[in-house]
A protein has these predicted regions:
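Divalent-metal coordination cores built from histidine and acidic residues
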Residues: 1-38
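His/Asp/Glu-enriched, well-ordered alpha-helical/loop segment
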Residues: 105-123, 139-151, 156-240
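Short, Lys/Arg- and Gly-enriched loop/turn segments at beta-strand edges
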Residues: 243-250
């Protein structure tokens, strides 16, 4: 299970989190992690009071801690990385880049993450959240070993005809937006779309596939059973045609219903 929030900076979290955010609560997160081992990743804003202690505790429990919805600059990202924030969620989204304040210029979270060599990133490569130039830049600077793809998809992804029950969001132009058009609210893309988008952006197919399989499995610490086709690993297999459309899928060795167009 991945947890995003509620320990997020309200200035960067977006309207969908309004009224639900707070600083890290030690009693809350320790009791939660002591009662279950299903949480494998937790996203938070490292600049919040208590966030570094939070990261150190999660790291001791083997939980991946990710930078998310943040305004941290270089020194903050450096301290966060040392405390246990080793990954950055939906890179470029919910965080500032290079910016100017009055007559002075400052690096943003984006540049700070690039300068933190050991930190990994994820890209919402749906063709809407990030342009092709940024996808190529991230690939060039972080490389296939430290870059993975993420759909960041809402429940409406791949759900044909699903009724939208949240009045604050709309589906428009192939993406989920806030109803007032103030910002994007999430993706409705599936992973095959992300791979196609990366290839269209000029990324080699082999690397695009690795960023959708092997790299995220390693970042999440499940590469002993996921992310590759090897003996004794989970038999998760996806067959694509030349246009990278799904022709068939197997999960744990079983053909997924309604995916087979091969036979």
């Amino acid at each position: 299970m991945r947890v995003e929030g509620p320990y997020l900076n309200p200035k960067r979290a977006g309207e969908q989190f309004a009224g639900k955010l707070k600083n890290p609560d030690k009693e809350e997160y320790t009791s939660l992690l002591e009662s279950t081992d299903c949480i494998k990743r937790w996203d938070a804003s490292p600049e919040l009071p208590g966030a570094l202690e939070f990261a150190r505790y999660l790291k001791s429990k083997g939980v991946l801690v990710a930078v998310s919805h943040t305004e941290s600059e270089y020194e903050g990202i450096k301290a966060a990385f040392e405390a246990g924030f080793t990954h950055t969620a939906h890179f470029y989204n919910g965080m500032p880049g290079f910016h100017k304040c009055r007559e002075y210029k400052y690096e943003g979270t984006v540049e700070s993450v690039y300068l933190t060599d050991g930190m990994t990133i994820e890209l919402i490569a749906d063709g809407i959240h990030l342009p092709a130039t940024i996808l190529r830049l991230a690939y060039k600077l972080k490389g296939v070993e430290k870059t993975c793809l993420v759909t960041d998809a809402l429940a409406y992804a791949a759900a044909d005809g699903m009724e939208i029950t949240d009045p604050n969001v709309i589906i428009e132009d192939g993406v989920c937006k806030m109803a007032d058009h103030s910002s994007l609210a999430g993706s409705i893309a599936t992973m095959d779309i992300l791979v196609r988008t990366m290839v269209k952006a000029g990324i080699p197919l082999a690397d695009a596939v690795r960023m959708a399989s092997e790299t995220p499995a390693r970042i999440m610490g499940v590469d002993d059973r996921k992310g590759a086709l090897q003996k004794d690993m989970d038999a998760d297999v996806l067959i694509l045609d030349r246009e990278l459309n799904i022709r068939a899928a197997w999960a744990m060795g079983r053909l997924v219903e309604d995916t087979n167009t091969l036979f």
